[in-house]
Amino acid sequence: MAALCVLGLSEVNMEMTIEKQKAVADDVLHKLFLIQPYAIVAGGAPRDWLDGKLATDVDVFVDTRHINTAKKERELFAVAGLLRFEKGEGRDWDDIPEHYKKNPNIKRVYNLEIDGVAVQLICVKCPCWDVVEQFPIPICQAWYKNGRIGTTLEYKLCKKVGALVITNHVY
């Protein structure tokens, strides 16, 4: 397994805020822009931020359809200034939560910590925007990009009626 050396860690973990989580998300998306301008933060973090809550982690979805090996993904993330890799092979699927393994669009997941914020780079084999609409629970169909949070119509309907429903059985 590859040894990950995370760049951008702070020595002092200041009190966590939604603004700090968004700043880390903005920084990651900015660093990814040249290699993948369509990367987005999606799922739980934008949903939690809309509800005024801290997110447990920030999931950054990166379209890596054009990249056929984990080594090339790691090299691109290193060029973006997000990772520095030492000798090793790549992520082991045993370390990845089961719900990610069930999603047919996810290729690999890289776990990072940046300035005290847990960040997951989730490599997908489809356009990032497609991932959002395929989330099986509409309350997770939210995304963050360019300082703004967006949601699907299904998300808005679920929030309005206060119901938790499953609308997609892709995984």
Predicted features and spans:
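Catalytic cores of the polymerase beta-like nucleotidyltransferase superfamily
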Residues: 2-171
